[in-house]
Amino acid sequence: MITQKEKEHLAKDKQNIYLRIISGIALVSLFVIAILCLKTLFYILMILVGLGMLSEWYNMTYPSINYLLIGLIIIPIPISLLIFLSMEESNRLVIMLYFCILWSVDTFAMIGGKTFKGIKLAPKISPKKTWTGLITGTVSAGLVSVLVSLIPNYHIEHYYFSNKIYLFIISCILALIAQSSDLFISYFKRKFNIKDSGHIIPGHGGVLDRFDSIILTAPVFFCINIYL
């Protein structure tokens, strides 16, 4: 027999999922338009994301100067690298692919974790994450990136992103790094006894909650584009 409290909890979870889906679709649509059509809008969005992440980091770590300084290093760098890459018109599609990888790993890791349950990945840092979620998210990100690359006229000049085998491998690596980045930020949130960094994005929490994966993935993505 389900208690009234459990019913309320289930109803709240259901409402949260709907909010997450609606706000997620809106956010993804905005970024797709910005990346593919309006370069200036992408710059503005990334700057706003960076400022939002810095603001939430400040609220989370204040008054610790050492941790504040960490935020001033780990947040502006990936934001700047993505903006720098987007300045080159030929990088437009590969940046779109990068965000598709991040969105798919986040989505399918959550679906895989909720569906298959299994052993906890890092129970002390992020209790809801599981190894099955990690594997599901990683493989799905690789498959999604390959499917996106099959879209007619979706031609990427970079060899390692245009080759389907290399693309799958790179996507899986970026997916693993994305989840490591998520755990990295979760460590700081647990340290300061914070569940969500904010509430500005309905169903997702704060800007830092939504975009934490770029912190470690953007530098790797940048190096792949520039040096390989």
From Swiss-Prot:
* Reactions it catalyzes: a 1,2-diacyl-sn-glycero-3-phosphate + CTP + H(+) = a CDP-1,2-diacyl-sn-glycerol + diphosphate
Query: Would you tell me the Gene Ontology cellular component terms?
Result: plasma membrane
Q: In which pathway does it act?
A: Phospholipid metabolism; CDP-diacylglycerol biosynthesis; CDP-diacylglycerol from sn-glycerol 3-phosphate: step 3/3
Give the domain of life.
Answer: Bacteria
User: What's a Pfam family this protein contains?
Assistant: CTP_transf_1
GO annotation, biological process: CDP-diacylglycerol biosynthetic process
Q: Which UniProt keywords apply?
A: Cell membrane, Lipid biosynthesis, Lipid metabolism, Membrane, Nucleotidyltransferase, Phospholipid biosynthesis, Phospholipid metabolism, Transferase, Transmembrane, Transmembrane helix
Primary localization class, coarse: membrane
Where is it located?
Cell membrane
Question: Which GO MF terms does the UniProt record name?
Answer: phosphatidate cytidylyltransferase activity
Tell me the InterPro entries matching this sequence: PC_trans
Residue ranges of the TM segments? 31-51, 65-85, 93-113, 131-151, 165-185, 206-226
**EC number(s) per entry:** 2.7.7.41
Q: What is the protein's membrane topology class?
A: Multi-pass membrane protein
Under the heading PANTHER family, the entry gives: PHOSPHATIDATE CYTIDYLYLTRANSFERASE (PTHR46382:SF1)
Q: Which family does it belong to?
A: Belongs to the CDS family.
Q: What is this protein called?
A: Phosphatidate cytidylyltransferase
Q: Which organism is it from?
A: Rickettsia prowazekii (strain Madrid E)
